[in-house]
Amino acid sequence: MKVVAFYLFGFLLLCSLWSCGERSASASTVSNEASLPLSKTKINGVSFVASRTVVSQKHINPVLSVHANYAAVMPFGFIRDLTNPEINFNSSRQWYGETRAGAGQYIDSLHKNGIKIMLKPQVWIWDGKFTGYLKMTSEEDWLKLEQSYRNFIIEYAELAAEKEVELFCIGTELEQFIVHRPAFWKAVIKEIRAIYTGKLTYAANWDEYKRVPFWESLDYIGVDAYFPVALSKTPTIDEASKGWKRWCEDLEAFSEVKQKQILFTEYGYRSVDFAGKEPWRSDREMNSVNLEAQNSTMQALFDSVWEKEWFAGGFLWKWFINHEEVGGTNNSQFTPQNKPVEQIIRKHYKNFN
């Protein structure tokens, strides 16, 4: 009887364990389906600035040294002013790295070193006017702009397909164009999908991303992350981290609604006083070098977002190919090269690679 009881108990125990295991697996499956993908490896990117010359191994070694696993390659098109519909691109007057041939050579060189690519064609308006204000004054000009932009972006979608790049950015900070012509954007995304089968994003300005109407058609919510996070001349890590709290809450909520991860298509801080106050500013009026402000704001960004499940990674703004000749402790611009913040980035990227 004890033997029978023993076997009966064992059988019931196995049934119980099987049932619990099944419920646990089922619950896990439901949880995984309802949540965003979690990866210990993030997109640790640099914005690889176009140059006059071809890229060689000496230009890529510093990118490897900082443990970047992605680079944004950025060919350019140029527009004369905010109401002009013609985009000039891929011309002999441009720097090599701004053209299709140059972008292709950069991609090949980076790929050979195991660095993945976001191809990010961008528009530059003469005199540095903000592209978010690009807006036509007539239907005729809107149609011309649409055709010109289609030619521009399809040219590089074809390059993305040819080079099998991992990620393609369909535009950068073009809010008025998107607000006024949403049907064009949805149509051109379909055209791009027919050519290029990799992942797609759009680089929305930090205060624009909630108004972009086509995130459902893309793979990542791209944000140029120049959020104001601190008012101090030399903010501490704690102050800047507190400044990130509200933005993180907004980003997480938006990611949850769209069921897509946030990708910082650009992020970074200048090495100047008040680096966290208006991080989008690139004008030369801000020229008081403050390396500590850059260090603190950068570390706060890493601490605030990089481990989050809703966060895919980001692309540091910006990284020049001639590493030994740029940046340095007297430089007040965005580049981290040859500044103390470079070591902060190196350590952080290594941990998420």
Where does each model-flagged region fall?
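Aromatic-lined carbohydrate-recognition surfaces of secreted/lumenal glycan-active proteins
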Residues: 119-123, 169-178, 186-210, 259-267, ...
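Glycoside hydrolase catalytic-domain groove-lining segments
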Residues: 99-105, 109, 113, 120, ...
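C-terminal motif of bacterial Sec signal peptides marking the signal peptidase cleavage site
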Residues: 17-19
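N-terminal substrate-binding region of glycoside hydrolase catalytic domains
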Residues: 30-104, 128-141, 175, 221-227, ...
